[in-house]
């Protein structure tokens, strides 16, 4: 299904609105949602960490978990993500976020062009 006249993709797999942090890639149905995510993820990380600290003080880096939660809140038309160039389910992305909690920092997000199949295969090797 192609994009609508207003530039909205109902099938996220076809979307050209893409954000990546080099490990995880999120697809958005509209440019509005993409910009909303890119403009707000850092502030959301701060809010998310404050919520966690109210319950327990933890040495873990919760940024990726916050980013996944924020993506789910921003993108209303589904969930489509790649993990290191391969399709990933919601659960797989969460497991990845739990694995990297011990890393001291999380990469920042940036807008990218949707990789072509050949480039995607290179990143998987």
Swiss-Prot record:
One of its GO terms (molecular function) is DNA binding. It comes from the Viruses. Pfam families: Phi-29_GP4. Keywords: Activator, DNA-binding, Early protein, Repressor, Sigma factor, Transcription, Transcription regulation. Residues 77-96 bind DNA. Gene3D superfamilies: Phi-29-like late genes activator, P4. The record marks 120 as: Interaction with host RNA polymerase and activation of the phi29 late A3 promoter. The keyword Transcription regulation applies. Signal peptide: none annotated. Interacts with host RNA polymerase (via C-terminus). Interacts with DNA; binds to the A2b, A2c and A3 promoters. Mediates, together with protein p6, the early to late transcriptional switch by stabilizing the binding of host RNA polymerase (RNAP) to the late A3 promoter. Activates transcription from the late A3 promoter and represses the main early promoters A2b and A2c by modifying the topology of the sequences encompassing early promoters A2c and A2b and late promoter A3 in a hairpin. Binds to a region of the A3 promoter located between nucleotides -50 and -100 relative to the transcription start site, that presents a sequence-directed curvature. Belongs to the phi29likevirus late genes activator p4 family. This is Late genes activator p4.
């Amino acid at each position: 299904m192609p994009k609508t006249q207003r530039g909205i993709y109902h099938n996220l797999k076809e979307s050209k609105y893409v954000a990546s942090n080099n490990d995880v890639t999120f697809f958005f149905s509209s440019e509005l949602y993409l910009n909303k995510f890119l403009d707000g993820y850092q502030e959301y990380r701060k809010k998310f960490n404050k919520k966690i600290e109210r319950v327990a003080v933890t040495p873990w880096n919760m940024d990726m978990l916050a980013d996944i939660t924020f993506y789910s809140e921003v993108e209303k038309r589904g969930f489509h993500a790649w993990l290191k160039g391969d399709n990933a389910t919601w659960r797989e992305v969460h497991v990845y976020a739990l694995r990297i909690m011990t890393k001291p920092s999380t990469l920042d997000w940036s807008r990218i062009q949707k990789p072509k199949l050949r480039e995607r295969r290179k990143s998987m090797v």
